Amino acid sequence: MSDTAATTESPTRSPLSEEVARRRTFAIISHPDAGKTTLTEKLLLFGGAINLAGQVKAKGERRNTRSDWMKIERERGISVVTSVMTFEFNDLVFNLLDTPGHEDFSEDTYRTLTAVDSAVMVIDAAKGIEARTRKLFEVCRLRDIPIITFINKMDRESRDTFDLLDEIEKTLALDTTPMTWPVGRGRDFLGTYDVVNGGVRLLEGGGAKTGATEQIDIADLGKRNPNLDVSEVRDELALASEACKPFELAAFREGHLTPVYFGSALRNFGVGDLLEGLGKFAPAPRAQDSDLRRVEAAEPRMSAFVFKIQANMDPNHRDRIAFARLCSGKLSRGMKAKLVRTGKNMSLSSPQFFFAQDRSVADEAFAGDVVGIPNHGTLRIGDTLTEGEDLTFVGVPSFAPEIVRRVRLTDAMKAKKLKEALQQMSEEGVVQVFRPRDGAPALVGVVGPLQLDVLKARLDAEYSLPVEFEISEFSLARWISSDDRKKLDAFVAANNSGIADDVDGDPVFMAKNEFYLGYTRERAEGITFSNVKDVKKKA
């Protein structure tokens, strides 16, 4: 292996640069059930952020995992919203964004990936690369996000280690460098060999133990398990050294290579190695693109963008939190910031750090940190906050829905309340709401049916609004625009029964099917139909 040390930093950095350099903001991506939420728990456990890790679908008195905090998440054992958790380890500040693994929540996940500098890809050792993992990896590749791989569940029956690495290299076109190597698999899994420093760490116990793992020399493995062929382990290591590329920090940071760790998140094994690897190799906050220029993290003036809105995190208070990724500078409690979309200033009087649904006041935060900003509808997804500069961060999109439904309210007297609730849910990004210009009932658009279940459950639990969903005459939605305002107005007038407004008041063409959409598009000269909408600079 080549040198694995992170790049050395200049000794003359400013205090701001020192703080920024301590940050590691990352997401965890995986296919559902690969162990992502369990790994999240154990990273927090190793980071000293919690005392007892929960278990997904836990029994008896074991509590639900910290990251899966919403009622529907606790009931189904899945993540449906992005949780943000901050903890410290080895004098570094980690901002962990736990994303939904289910494909129905891909939009929330995509936006989350705009807010991170690196990602951990969790792979089930028995299943290898799965469809959802591949899709999320492609998003990371588009955004040049470096990937660290954790192959999980090594203590269960699993595929051949070389097969797993070969699949990563061929399926994802990504070089692999094992940083640890499994000794045995399934019931015979004894632990991992530290490829960089030598020595075998043994799998011991389980539960909430995070003490130092026992480490022995590879020559002593035979004494622990007489059935183990130590020479076979040595042969595997020699073959891995020949077959896999040596670790190069630049190749990793550029997204060409992934360091690979093996373990069992459920049994707390391999998690410490992964966390140390994140601290050593994952980049500090990177420069962010705006419509005017690239913004460097160590610039003195604060800037940030909103990538998520979450309402009613505390059911006892109708609160609304905007999650903002700091892109540069330092945020101080009480400072004023310019909301670029409106051109108005707002006071950041009580910014907050989060730990799933728990929160604490953020007196100060630095580039790379994720803070919650309480507000009453002022902030929206994609908004940019600055200390005066008129720039807008780009790349926080909305996607056209794949399912469109009408909302039927069982109690017509609550129509106004439903309108307000849907507005709030759409601003959160839970669903998209389209209001037909001909006065017909509102339509909701989602990526998959599970989103409808979440919407129904939240409307009932948070607003006491029992609803049903009905098939709509429309199945597709496309944002429409034109360089010629008169042409756009004429198109809207001619197709009024199929025009709706989104949450921002932008016009959307609702189509019955693909054929009708294509037919209309061919005849709409000068009109652009888009299935993706990026943030706007001005309202």
Model features per residue range: what roles?
Residues 1-539:
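Structural and coupling elements of P-loop NTPases
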